[in-house]
Amino acid sequence: GAVISAVKIVSRTHHEPVAVGRDAVFRPYWQNGKPVLMVLVVGETARAQNFSLGGYPRDTNRDLLPYAGDLFYFANTVSCGTSTAVSLPCMFSAAGRRDFKPGSEVYTENLLDIFARTGYRVLWRENNSGCKNNCNRVETETFCRNYACKDEILLKDFVARANALAGNALIVLHQQGSH
């Protein structure tokens, strides 16, 4: 079962990750000459049906309202699994939900690699159970283990860290959410 699968993954002979998205290029969306800063928040048990950004009638995202014009809300998303170990690597994989093979993230590039290759600085900030091999090749900051701190820790020195990245940047905030 699971032990045999883990041994197969670890014993693979790939030393360099299998490349994906080699033809990807950065095309600026905004024509203002300023660097792009994207922040992607991923986390646990955030029920889309309860987000006012997605049309829920209660005001559940009040603090984000001043920024609503600058946000992209991904409404048509489906999880690849019910565990972080499966859903997180699948989310960043080029394979897609139907073709994703758990364990392939160990030896295959992902979305973060593509961003880095197209000139983005990539930073993964974490207060959850680890990046599940998504952040192996990018800068990573882990704030606590075993759910010992709240999600707001991910904002510690956020502006300074974002400014220090200089140029186009992607910051992933992997929150523990409502564990």
Predicted regions and their residues:
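Active-site-proximal alpha/beta segments of enzymes that process anionic O-linked groups
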Residues: 1-40, 45-179
